[in-house]
Amino acid sequence: EECKLCYYLKIKHGIYQPSMPMPGVFSAINTRLQGNLVGKNLHVLSKNLPDGEVVTQEGWVESNVVPGTDVFIKGKYDLLVKLPDETHLLVDLKISQPGDDKIEKYKTQLGAYKFALENPASPAGGPKDGKKIVVSKLGLLIFYPDRVKFEKGEAVLSFPPSWLDVPIDDELFLEFVGKIDKLLAGAPPAESLSCKWCQYRHVGDQLAHVGSGPVQDDLPF
């Protein structure tokens, strides 16, 4: 859903959209939730979650090149869970209101991490492939506060977990990567009429570069 021109500029030229950092409170909640799950079965949190032990938190991945393209995957997933059958569940943890729309929004991201885990980049000077991890399930673990109580001098927020299964569709993922490859191999796409950053960049450039007009040098602050 990202603007195609903004994506092109980011990947091809390293020009990122300006962004605000995540508020510290969300990072703190996210880190504590993830960290306290490592080494534990998800059933410790809720019996409604899949049966499996969280083995890794915030793991970096990098893939081999996706076949038929010049694209590779690089990024960081949230949680990796080992299932009873020795395969793995890949989990994206969100502090957000749960909703089925999240499945569509994050399925490509989870599919990308799945590909990277199953097709790891070759280590420098090592064998053809790194350690392959088989991923048989994808899911979203979503927390959203719904109650608060005051006790013993503390405000205690309740964060009940919600679980959403994300279907695996390797064929759809490869088709999507093919489109990405085609986009990056061509000329820059046009500005998006609905992208606020494109509008800001375009109008800002016009207003800031006014040819021989006056420029304010003696700034008041």
Which residues does each predicted region cover?
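Metal-dependent nuclease catalytic cores that hydrolyze phosphodiester bonds in DNA/RNA
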Residues: E1-T87, Q97, L219-F221
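Accessory terminal regions of nucleic-acid processing enzymes
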Residues: E2-H13, D85, K132, P167-F221
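Catalytic phosphate/metal-binding cores of nucleic-acid and nucleotide-processing enzymes, i.e., regions
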Residues: M20-P23, D100-D101, I133, D205-L207
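Short acidic alpha-helical/loop segments enriched in Asp/Glu that coordinate divalent cations
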Residues: L49, E53, A124-G130, A190
